[in-house]
């Protein structure tokens, strides 16, 4: 069992990106500013700095090698999930399972939402197989953690056996 956790800023291209951070919040820091009071334009606890970013494809190649196959990839990037996936598009066929947190509302300025990510993954060979978690705020569903499986993975056959 070989597992690596890699904490880095990923995007669909290399370069510098503005990164919004709140010194008093333990969540929500992102390249896409949150549409919340914690990251409002008048909040003096929020700082913006330029950080270096890389693509998922380059990160995997540099850390795991050119021929890496990924059994399980989790992405929770505060609205940047689609950008990260686009930056790893050539890797997608080698990934078996994806777990993504996806917003259903405009939670991060210019952040991707569930429908766009779902459409991209379906077009690139993945099936949604399970909603792992629902996140609500004041009774409104705002995000989901969703499990996607590569349509060419043997797991799809097992799932189909259970369903049909």
Please name every model-derived segment:
Residues 1-164:
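Phosphate/nucleotide-binding beta-alpha loop and adjacent structural elements of enzyme active sites
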